[in-house]
């Protein structure tokens, strides 16, 4: 297995364009890892009096949610454009807006409303940038390498999520948050340059889904296979949302433990997800939808012990949960990449991102009321049970689809 895994990755990394794109994505992921902490910390610094909690929440949301608006607003302009142009546009917008925030903060001119506006502006192309990224990955990896290249990109995100916040916490003791946002802006500029240099890969073989090239992504999402996959992904991420609220309360209130234990939970999860992403790239010739269902059920099962088990058991369950949860994103993207041809893939992925983008924030929003009524442990276990139910429903939903379609998705 190990030699097979190394062979798959070695074959991909022999291509200069693949190395360039992955290097850019890795740098950008690390920059975003820094910004997980930095954006909220800068919001704390400049928040209006008596509005700290509201303003921090608004700033964090502004860095993500306006991408839904951009997915719709820019559809006519970007439909049919090269994938690298979409990714470059996203990178330029991120770099420009984040760089503007850093400059205004350094000169003492960053007002709270300008901060939110610039964060929102930076996220307008998020859906199209993600679409461009995964279209380029699909083209570079080809049918045999999609899972592997998706997994490498996801592994970089997992690594950045582990290291970035820790590094930001250390650096913010010595440097201003504006400087770290300037660094994040530089990583996006770097990604834009290398993505453009990576160029267009060989197009996927096959006819467009419809006679028209670059058809509307939202129209294509009505296809039963794509619609069911999008719905399952949306609900899965929605059910994950309450975990982000309940786990800190579980550690602080239920266990009466220090913040360090919360860090241990998330670190074990992140390490598990990182390892799983690297392993997932070797999956070939398997029924990808069946594996996706097993991931959903497995993650749900790992949350149930929080209702009754001691700390060592829940730590082990959460680490195993990271191993199980980690491959979900590269797997589901591989399913999309194989369900649409290159001409339609960017529009489909942008529409998918616009729909899915709001799921986790909505789940997080209901996490507070759920913790208040069910308790933290009850919310974690309830999320797990609901996720297990989702696996059952999704299994029924996918029963009627063609059995040979998933096998072509590697």
Question: Can you say where each PLM-predicted feature lies in the sequence?
Answer:
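Juxtamembrane intracellular "pre-TM" segments in multi-pass secondary transporters
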Residues: 1-19, 200-231
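A single, central transmembrane helix in multi-pass transporters
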Residues: 22, 26-46, 53, 175-182, ...
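Hydrophobic core of transmembrane alpha-helices in multi-pass small-molecule transporters
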Residues: 26, 97, 110-128, 313-327
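Transmembrane alpha-helix termini and helix-breaking/packing motifs in multi-pass membrane transporters
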Residues: 38-47, 102-107, 163-183, 253-254, ...
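C-terminal transmembrane bundle of multi-pass solute transporters/carriers
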Residues: 57-96, 100-101, 247-248, 252-410
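Cytoplasmic helix-loop-helix junction between adjacent transmembrane helices
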Residues: 118-159
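Helix-loop junctions on the cytosolic side of multi-pass membrane transporters
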Residues: 135-139, 181-209, 286, 396-407
